[in-house]
Amino acid sequence: MSDPQIPPFRRAKRLAHQKVSEILAIGARAAELQRQGHPVIVLGAGEPDFPTPPHVIEAAHRAALAGQTTYTPLAGTPELKAAIVEKFRRENGLDYAPNEVIATAGAKQVIFNAFMASLDAGDEVIIPTPYWTTYSAMVDICGGIPVTVTCGEDSGFKITPAQLQAAITPQTRWLMLNSPSNPTGAA
């Protein structure tokens, strides 16, 4: 029963034209078919196909027993940021300061946060296609304009210098590069 004093939930106007993520819709349909007993190979959103390694479980258990159960700093703990800095130095030959590192719960969240913090209405984001289904929606929700550039098999699904140059305008604010690419695997 609804309370007449409480208005019904209403989506924000900026979300009115946003559709359900295609990948989530495909995953839901695949799960429905599996429940009906149909054999389905799910090529939707990826989930690990291996159990959490024992040393990770043990480290999480030790941390919980040590009382590390409260919120951490939004950009990551100093220890985590130091480990990330060291990883980039050791494996990639890149030098960053800890204040240049932000650790989040997922790639899409940090991308959305960056767009929300930096895009104004009309700013453009170049997105090579094919691309992960939510990139253009994130740009749109944050007030930007997704500018897609088709990257076909002939270029190894990579944006070419000529394509990039043609896509850049005075309104360009970002170039979205995902390596290796999801869904093509191009690096």
What are these regions (language model features)?
Residues 39, 123-124, 145, 171-174:
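Structural signature of beta-strand start/N-cap positions in the alpha/beta core
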Residues 95-101, 121-124, 171:
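Short acidic capping loops at alpha-helix termini that bridge into adjacent secondary structure
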Residues 2-106, 113:
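N-terminal small-domain helix-loop-helix segment of the aminotransferase-like
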Residues 140-147:
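A short helix-loop-beta submotif of the ANL/AMP-binding
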Residues 117-139:
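Conserved PLP-anchoring active-site segment centered on the Schiff-base-forming lysine
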Residues 29, 114, 163-167:
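CheY-like receiver
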Residues 147, 152-187:
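Active-site phosphate-binding strand-loop segment of PLP-dependent enzymes
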